[in-house]
UniProtKB/Swiss-Prot annotation:
Pathway: Cofactor biosynthesis; biotin biosynthesis; biotin from 7,8-diaminononanoate: step 2/2. Its cofactor is [4Fe-4S] cluster; [2Fe-2S] cluster. Homodimer. Binds 1 [4Fe-4S] cluster. The cluster is coordinated with 3 cysteines and an exchangeable S-adenosyl-L-methionine. Binds 1 [2Fe-2S] cluster. The cluster is coordinated with 3 cysteines and 1 arginine. Transmembrane segments: none annotated. This is Biotin synthase. Its EC number is 2.8.1.6. Residues 43-272 form the Radical SAM core domain. Belongs to the radical SAM superfamily. Biotin synthase family. GO terms for molecular function: 2 iron, 2 sulfur cluster binding; 4 iron, 4 sulfur cluster binding; biotin synthase activity; iron ion binding. CDD domains: Radical_SAM. It catalyses: (4R,5S)-dethiobiotin + (sulfur carrier)-SH + 2 reduced [2Fe-2S]-[ferredoxin] + 2 S-adenosyl-L-methionine = (sulfur carrier)-H + biotin + 2 5'-deoxyadenosine + 2 L-methionine + 2 oxidized [2Fe-2S]-[ferredoxin].
């Protein structure tokens, strides 16, 4: 198959991606591994740490999210925006534990100018001064705000598509798909890397998964980072009763993402704590080359650092070098 060559394409059709996704599993993994080896050192796995810097009270109605103010049955402690010195102390701790990227998430619908945004800029500058990559997820933003983030040295902005355009309305009604794409366009116009992926296991079809990947792969260039999340059902959210996905579904999604976006960093994200060591290794063989590292991802559990250290030692993983500051 030509896909094994790992050519960069922006013209994938949904049908092509569905066919690719549904290949016999070993054949799919073989193609994905070949593409991965052509564009990446297969032994390098980036470790990213994720911190919720402002928790709960979000006005969005995302069906999967415990931080939504719409889901009043969720037992979640709401917290105001953390102080920069507290965040930077945790970033230093994450770096000392081996993390190379520090991601900060605020449960906002959109960025608003003022003291809180200024505090986020201070956090970004501080993380970069530690020699780490800095990523934030803050919701929608305007051009002047993206410019300020770029000036602060922000490496990447996370803004996920979550799912396909066709299934999106079943999951979120308070923000349109077009809103998300506009935010991504603004971010990229200021030279900030895109961290953009989605979630599987929310009731979508295989075609929905392929459609989401098609939207991502049509971007020029492809997103620099593509997080692949498996739904973590949370009591009190509309998706609380959804069954856990089969780990091999996550393997297929990772492998397909790797083939259609050969140069992107594919990040194994939420839901990893439910995978045993062998399933995680299978995802890495299939093209994942980054994981979220730390005990908690925003408000959901993650694999423990000790478990991860044992995993990386077992596979001989090498560290990823943080991106340099623009002035360097």
């Amino acid at each position: 198959m030509s896909e094994a060559a790992g050519e960069i394409r922006n013209d994938w059709s949904v049908e092509e991606i569905v066919t690719l996704h549904n290949l016999p599993l070993l054949e799919l993994i073989g193609h994905a591994n070949a593409v991965h080896g052509r564009h990446h050192n297969p032994n390098v796995v980036q470790k990213a740490s994720l911190l919720s810097i402002k928790t709960g009270g979000c006005p969005e109605d995302c069906a999967y999210c415990p931080q939504s103010a719409h889901h009043r049955e969720v037992k979640l402690t709401k917290d105001r925006l953390m102080q920069p010195e507290t965040v930077l102390a945790l970033a230093k701790r994450a770096k000392d534990a081996g993390a190379e990227r520090f991601c900060m998430g605020a449960a906002w619908r959109q960025v608003r100018d003022g003291k809180e945004f200024d505090a986020v800029l201070t956090m970004v500058r501080g993380v970069r001064d530690l020699g780490m990559e800095a990523c934030v997820t803050l919701g929608m933003l305007e051009k002047h705000q993206a410019e300020k983030l770029a000036e602060a040295g922000l490496t990447a902005y996370n803004h996920n598509l979550d799912t396909s355009p066709e299934f999106y309305g079943e999951i979120i009604t308070t923000r349109s798909y077009a809103d998300r794409l506009e935010t991504l366009s603004i971010v990229r116009s200021f030279g900030i890397d895109l961290c953009c992926g989605g979630i599987i296991g929310m009731g979508e079809t295989i075609r929905d998964r392929a459609s989401m990947l098609q939207v991502l792969a049509s971007m020029r260039p492809h997103p620099e980072s593509v997080p692949i999340n498996a739904l973590v059902p949370v009591e009190g959210t509309p998706l609380a009763a959804m069954p856990r996905i089969d780990p091999l579904e996550l393997v297929r999604m990772v492998a397909t993402a790797r083939i259609v976006m050969p140069k992107s960093t594919v990040r194994l994200s939420a839901g990893r704590s439910t995978l045993n060591r062998e399933a995680q290794i299978l995802c890495l063989v299939s093209g994942a080359n980054s994981v979220f590292y730390g005990d908690t991802l925003l408000t959901t559990p993650n694999a423990g650092i000790g478990e991860d250290e044992a995993l990386f030692a077992a596979i001989g993983a090498l560290p990823h070098e943080a991106a340099p500051l623009a002035a360097e």
